[in-house]
C-alpha cells in the first residue's frame, strides 16, 4: 500500500515558524515520555498533555516494527508510521493537534541498529549492504541485531534522509537517538580479540563520528530549532558541543549519572542517607560539562508502582519521596523528562500540573540552565539533617527562586536558611501540600528576612520544612519593596513571564480542534499558592500507585 503523505492539510504554521527559538537553549523544556499504545485516542493524549502543562512529548518509536516485544526499538520500515495506531493521516493529525496545543513532538529514533529479517535490510541485495562487512563485528553484542556500516555513503544518505523525512514530512520537533554508545565504540560490549581497532589503534568508530557530525549539521541547517538528543552512557566528551568545534553537535544528552545517583540515594533508609550525601550533591560538579536532560522516565523508574518499590518507608513516605524526586528534578539545572502513569491518582496529577506551572512561570528555573550564574548553593553540607538548599537565578535579583529540600523522614519546625538579601520570601510551592496527598507542613505567611547570620550570609529566614519534602520560595529584595507602586507593579509583571513556548506558537490550548476537549485554564502569573491553613497531621494517604 502506498500513502500520499503530501495530501494532508497542516494547521500548525505558527508553531513551525517559531520552532527555531529552541536553538538558544533558554526555553523551558518539560517532556512527558510515553508510548502511543497507552492511549485510547489522539484526543485523549493531547488533552492530558495540555492540561498537565508539558511543553513536549517524547514518543517511543512510531516507525513500523514487527516484533511487539521490542517496543518498537527494532525498526523494520523507517519511512512508515506503524499501522498499530492508525493511518499515516492519523499520525499527521496527532502531530498537528499537539502543535496547535503548543506541545512539541520528540520521536525516539534508532540509527544504531536494525533487526535481522530476510524481508528487511539484512543482506538487502544478497550481500552486507547496510550492515558492517565483518560478520563477527556486524552483530549487536546485546540485542543480536545488525549494526550499520557508517562508512558506506549509501547508509549515510539513507539515515540522514530518514531523519529529515520525519522532521519535514511529519513535522517532528526532535529526535532522541537510541543506543549511541553502540555507534561510537568499536569495542562496545566486546572482549579483546572480538573487535578491530581503527587506523590509530584506538576503539573509536571514526566512520560513526563523521556520520553523526554530518547528520546533525544537515538536520540543523534544514530544520532550525529541531532538538537532537543522545542517549549515551559511555561519557563521550563534549557530546553536545558544536560541530564547528569538531564535536558531535547534539543539543542535549540524557543525564544518566544524575538519575543513577539520585535513585541510589533515595533507595537508602533516611537514617543512613547522611553517609551518601555526596550522591545528592555530586551532580553540580559536572552539570555544565554537557547540555543535559534530567530523566525520571520509564527506563529509569518504570511505573509508579515500580518507582515506589525502589523507595524505603511506609506507603505515605514512598508517595512523599516520589513527589520530592519530581520536584527536585524540576528545580535542578537541566531540561526535564518524566513518565508518571497516565492514570495516576488525582493528587499526583494536580501535583505534576502545579510543578510544571511553577517551572514555566519562573525564568530562573530554565533561562541559565547552562551557565554557572544560574545556580548557587545555600546549604551544601547539611548531611546530618539530610537537607540541601540552593538558589536558581537570572540576571535580575527579583527573579531569584530559593529551594529547600529535606530528605529526612522527620519535619523541621523552625529551620533556618541563609538568604541572599533583605526582603520578602513567599512560598510558591510545597510538595507536602494536602492537595497533593501530603500532611500540610507548609509556610502560609510571607517570610521577612531577618538580620541574623546563617550559612555565611548576613540575612536569613526561619521556616517549616516538611519531612521528605521540598519548599520553594520567590525572593523580592527590599529595594524593590520600597519602589513606587506603579514601578513595583511593572517589576512584578516581569517576574511572572509565563510559558513563552506556547505563546510563541501563536495558539492557546483552547484553540485545539473541537475533537479535543477545550482547556480554558491558562498558566497563572505565579505558581499556585498554598491554600491550606491547618498544619495538623492527617491519616495516611492512599498509595500513589493505586488506580484512580
Model regions and ranges:
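Substrate-binding/active-site clefts of carbohydrate-active enzymes
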Residues: 13-26, 35-40, 44-204, 463
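Alpha-helical packing segments of well-folded alpha/beta enzyme cores
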Residues: 45, 90, 94, 155-166, ...
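Hydrophobic faces of well-ordered beta-strands that scaffold small-molecule active sites
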Residues: 30-34, 57-59, 105-107, 175, ...
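Active-site/binding-pocket entry motifs
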Residues: 37, 65, 299-302, 434
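Carbohydrate-interacting/catalytic domains
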Residues: 1-29, 37, 43-53, 319, ...
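Conserved alpha/beta catalytic core and glycan-binding cleft of carbohydrate-active enzymes
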Residues: 171-173, 188-340, 360-432, 439-440
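Soluble or luminal CAZymes and related metallo-dependent hydrolases
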Residues: 40-41, 87-90, 154-159, 204-211, ...
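Active-site proximal loops enriched in glycine and acidic residues that flank catalytic Cys/His/Asp
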Residues: 61, 82, 108-109, 152, ...
Amino acid at each position: 500500500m502506498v500513502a500520499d503523505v503530501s495530501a494532508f492539510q497542516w494547521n500548525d504554521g505558527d508553531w513551525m515558524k517559531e520552532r527555531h527559538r529552541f536553538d538558544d537553549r533558554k526555553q523551558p523544556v518539560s517532556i512527558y515520555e510515553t508510548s502511543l499504545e497507552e492511549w485510547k485516542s489522539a484526543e485523549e493524549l493531547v488533552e492530558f498533555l495540555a492540561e498537565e502543562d508539558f511543553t513536549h512529548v517524547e514518543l517511543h518509536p512510531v516507525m513500523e516494527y514487527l516484533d511487539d516485544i521490542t517496543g518498537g526499538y527494532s525498526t523494520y520500515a523507517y519511512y512508515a508510521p506503524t499501522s498499530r495506531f492508525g493511518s499515516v493521516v492519523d499520525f499527521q493529525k496527532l502531530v498537528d493537534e499537539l502543535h496547535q496545543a503548543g506541545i512539541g513532538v520528540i520521536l525516539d529514533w534508532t540509527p544504531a541498529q536494525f533487526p535481522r529479517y530476510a524481508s528487511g535490510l539484512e543482506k538487502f541485495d544478497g550481500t552486507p549492504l547496510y550492515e558492517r562487512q565483518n560478520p563477527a563485528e556486524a552483530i549487536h553484542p546485546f540485542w543480536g541485531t545488525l549494526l550499520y556500516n557508517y562508512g558506506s555513503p549509501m547508509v549515510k544518505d539513507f539515515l540522514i534522509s530518514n531523519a529529515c523525512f520525519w522532521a519535514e514530512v511529519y513535522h517532528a520537533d526532535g529526535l532522541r537517538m537510541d543506543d549511541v554508545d553502540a555507534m561510537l565504540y568499536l569495542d562496545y560490549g566486546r572482549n579483546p580479540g572480538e573487535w578491530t581497532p581503527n587506523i590509530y589503534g584506538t576503539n573509536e568508530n571514526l566512520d560513526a563520528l563523521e556520520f553523526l557530525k554530518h547528520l546533525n549539521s544537515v538536520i540543523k541547517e534544514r530544520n532550525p530549532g529541531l532538538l537532537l538528543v543522545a542517549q549515551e552512557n559511555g561519557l563521550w566528551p563534549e557530546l553536545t558541543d558544536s560541530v564547528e568545534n569538531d564535536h558531535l553537535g547534539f543539543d542535549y544528552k540524557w543525564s544518566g549519572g544524575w538519575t543513577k545517583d539520585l535513585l541510589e540515594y533515595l533507595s537508602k533508609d533516611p537514617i543512613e542517607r547522611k553517609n551518601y550525601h555526596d550522591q545528592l550533591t555530586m551532580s553540580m560538579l559536572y552539570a555544565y560539562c554537557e547540555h543535559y536532560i534530567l530523566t525520571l522516565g520509564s527506563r529509569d523508574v518504570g511505573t509508579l508502582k515500580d518507582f515506589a518499590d525502589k523507595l524505603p518507608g511506609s506507603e505515605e513516605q514512598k508517595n512523599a519521596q516520589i513527589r520530592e524526586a519530581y520536584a527536585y528534578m524540576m528545580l535542578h539545572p537541566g531540561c526535564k523528562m518524566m513518565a508518571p502513569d497516565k492514570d495516576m491518582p488525582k493528587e499526583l496529577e494536580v501535583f505534576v500540573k502545579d510543578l510544571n506551572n511553577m517551572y514555566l512561570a519562573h525564568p530562573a528555573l530554565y533561562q541559565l540552565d547552562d551557565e554557572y550564574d544560574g545556580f548557587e548553593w545555600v546549604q551544601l553540607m547539611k548531611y546530618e539533617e539530610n537537607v540541601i538548599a540552593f538558589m536558581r537565578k537570572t540576571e535580575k535579583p527579583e527573579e531569584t527562586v530559593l529551594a529547600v529540600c529535606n530528605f529526612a523522614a522527620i519535619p523541621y519546625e523552625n529551620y533556618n536558611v541563609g538568604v541572599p538579601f533583605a526582603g520578602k520570601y513567599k512560598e510558591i510551592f510545597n510538595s507536602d501540600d494536602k492537595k497533593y496527598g501530603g500532611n500540610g507542613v507548609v509556610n502560609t505567611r510571607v517570610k521577612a528576612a531577618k538580620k541574623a547570620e546563617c550559612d555565611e550570609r548576613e540575612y536569613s529566614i526561619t521556616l517549616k520544612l516538611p519531612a521528605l519534602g521540598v519548599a520553594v520560595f520567590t525572593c523580592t529584595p527590599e529595594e524593590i519593596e520600597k519602589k513606587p507602586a506603579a514601578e513595583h507593579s511593572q517589576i512584578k509583571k516581569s517576574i511572572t513571564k509565563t510559558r513563552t513556548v506556547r505563546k510563541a506558537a501563536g495558539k492557546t490550548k483552547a484553540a485545539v480542534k473541537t475533537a479535543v476537549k477545550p482547556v480554558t485554564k491558562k498558566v497563572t502569573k505565579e505558581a499556585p499558592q498554598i491554600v491550606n491553613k491547618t498544619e495538623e497531621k492527617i491519616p495516611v494517604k492512599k498509595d500513589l500507585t493505586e488506580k484512580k
